[in-house]
Amino acid sequence: MEKKFRITECEIIPTEGTALSENFSLLNGSPVINYYESLKSPAISANVSFLDTDGVVSNESIMGGEMLRFTVDFAELGTFSIDENKHKLMIGGVKNVNTKSSKQTATLDAISVESFINETARVAGRYKDTSIDETVRKLIGEGAGIRAIKTDKSVFAEPTANKYSFVGNLRRPIDTIQWLCPKASSSTNHFGYLFYETYDGYNFRSIDTLLKQPPVKTFSKTEIAGADDSRILNEQFNSSNDIGMALRMGMYANNTGYFDIRTGTFGYETFTVTDLDLKRPPKLPGGLGESPSRLMFRILDVGALQDGDAVPNSNQKAQDLAKYQNKSYARNNLIFSQSLNIVVPCDPTLRAGQVITVELPLPTSDQKNKQMGDGTRDLSGDYLISELRHEIGGNRAHTQLSLVRDTFTATA
């Protein structure tokens, strides 16, 4: 049985410059709400499909810029609420407007207002010898600079082990943070960060830290119908590894060349997927994965970051940065190349970036392999929530989860 719920509030909130003169409730239009979070997205989003009985889309000229507010009361899990002052979801457009003689339906798309601010903000100046997590806090948050994104949303930036100096070059703030993610390292052996937004705020976190979290909940597959809200309603395993694209991106092997303008010297760094020390490394036939499939070139202009005539004294070599980036790219591609998609009764307490335990029954043919310690065929285990979608309305409430785990470095 699905969770008992009631949508108690679903409103369009007017803002300065919009045609709507007062709050407009969508409750009479039987709204269906979809709410999204993803480790790959720097913004939460939502859409509301409704029966436009009052013709608000056409009569009030809803074109975007309004704020979205909704509240859903769950019998057991409390209230799930999106507030225009805390979460700041702005309507970015209206789609699927379908007009018939007796009714009109429409869908409102909303996304964090910071995504729109990002399009007008630009990063200027130098960021010299600054830890990457500190740079993130300068680019977004309450303490952000005048050209960055000031927001009162929570910003959690996990400390990085390395620093990175760069010039803003008028990049957008969120684009800059995502550009810094593969350059960040939590230790000498752990590479790559993710920047994403959840219901609770912004997160800049190490991939390894996310994978090592303890599970917050357990969901099991059972054929017995009942009131168990931790059961899995549906599951599907997906493998999206594109060998051609992986070769084009240099995931298996690549070369990065450097030219130092100051010294006039040239060097290069070679990377292969074996550098990740994987217990189950991906292999290609005929030694295809051993030859570099991507060549990259960088110019090192250290003079752009020096003060006066003094030559910058950086403890981090360009080759070290290349190792961080190459290992981060490869690790991300491997982790997200396989996913387990499950559907569970709606659980608004879940967040992208949390770890859950999934328990699925083993086929009879796998029981023997399981007893022999071969865990590669067992889909049960701890998974990281990569993407999350709450679908609420139409007399049902489900949560769809896209789950990933590090199968390549997991111990058999």
Residue positions per predicted region:
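Assembly/oligomerization scaffold segments
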Residues: 1-120
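Envelope-exposed proteins and targeting segments
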Residues: 6-8, 44, 66, 85-90, ...
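Solvent-exposed coil/turn segments that connect beta secondary-structure elements
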Residues: 15, 51-53, 73-75, 90-97, ...
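An acidic/polar, Gly/Ser/Thr-rich interaction patch typically located in mid-to-C-terminal regions
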Residues: 33-63, 224-412
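Second-shell loop/turn segments in exported
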Residues: 57, 120-129, 162-168
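Sec/Tat-exported extracytoplasmic proteins
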Residues: 58, 143, 181-188, 360
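Glycine-rich, acidic and aromatic/proline-enriched surface loops and short helix-turn segments
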Residues: 97, 104-105, 109-116, 128-154
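Short beta-strand-centered interaction patches in the first periplasmic/extracellular domains
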Residues: 105-108, 112-114, 153-247
